[in-house]
């Protein structure tokens, strides 16, 4: 997910994306705990995407 794509979204779309990524993160954690996850780097990528979205939400809140 690119930063430019995220910047073009409004606050509601970012919140929806954040919710979706948190659900994905939970699924990946459960898969890792049960030993089913082969590509563990996905957890890190999702965590970083969540951080990007939270940063953008904070920036947009400050501007308003």
Curated annotation (Swiss-Prot):
Cross-referenced InterPro entries: Ribosomal_protein_uL29, Ribosomal_uL29, Ribosomal_uL29_CS, Ribosomal_uL29_sf
PROSITE patterns for this protein: RIBOSOMAL_L29
GO biological process: translation
GO CC field: cytosolic large ribosomal subunit
Disulfide bonding pattern of the chain: none
An annotated Gene Ontology molecular function: structural constituent of ribosome
Key words of the record: Ribonucleoprotein, Ribosomal protein
Protein name: Large ribosomal subunit protein uL29
């Amino acid at each position: 997910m690119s930063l430019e794509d995220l910047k073009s979204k409004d606050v509601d779309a970012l919140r929806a994306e954040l919710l979706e990524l948190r659900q994905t993160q939970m699924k990946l954690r459960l898969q890792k705990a049960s030993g089913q996850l082969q590509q563990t780097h996905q957890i890190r990528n999702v965590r970083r995407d969540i951080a990007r979205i939270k940063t953008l939400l904070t920036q947009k809140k400050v501007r308003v």
